[in-house]
Amino acid sequence: MTPLIRYFSKANAQAFVERGEVLFRALSFFRDYEEDAGVRSDEHEGTLIHLPADGLRVTLTKTGESIALPHRLESTAKEDQIFVYCMSTELSENIAQRFKAEVAVELLEPVKFLAKLRSALSLRKSLHVNKLVHNPIRYYEWHEPPIVDWALPEWIAMRKHKSFEWQKEYRFAVPAGDAFRVENVSVRLVPPGQPRSPRSEAHPKLLLKLGNLSKICRVHAL
């Protein structure tokens, strides 16, 4: 694995390096975050969207006729039961500025970090550490065919719209319960202009303490 970057405030950087504090948040937190649209906030976090440019084609069962609907297809994972920790593959002044970061911490040995992460997660009985996934985010356009991705919650958790591609995100994701079970998603057709569902008031989070990480990190002042 290549080095990974996390953008922090000074206080949070100190907590990460000295105590190994890693805060996993539920996908629903980022879905409902309202303070910085297009940075941390993503109202479609945890949802795979398919919206073809020429309309969503469906076949009428009675007549066999194919028609194009203006609706979009949404497949949503269990957003309160999938916890993620987000980093970046790029040390960038632009990324730092957009996140309003004071410090960038470069994780020099991600494999050692991952081992510590697995060990800490294994102590949380509600989580499935054996199903922990970690990869660069796959960025996509809504017109792209969803293939089988719509039925796979762990793939949905690792995808974001291309408008976020500047973040070069690398994500760690772990499920609670059966959140990664195949087809454990809510699928619906959404008509144009339909109001967004009410936002959640509570968003689960998970604070891990991995111990001092200074030997596998480099701190960059911004």
Residue ranges and their predicted role:
Residues M1-L222:
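NAD-dependent ADP-ribosyltransferases
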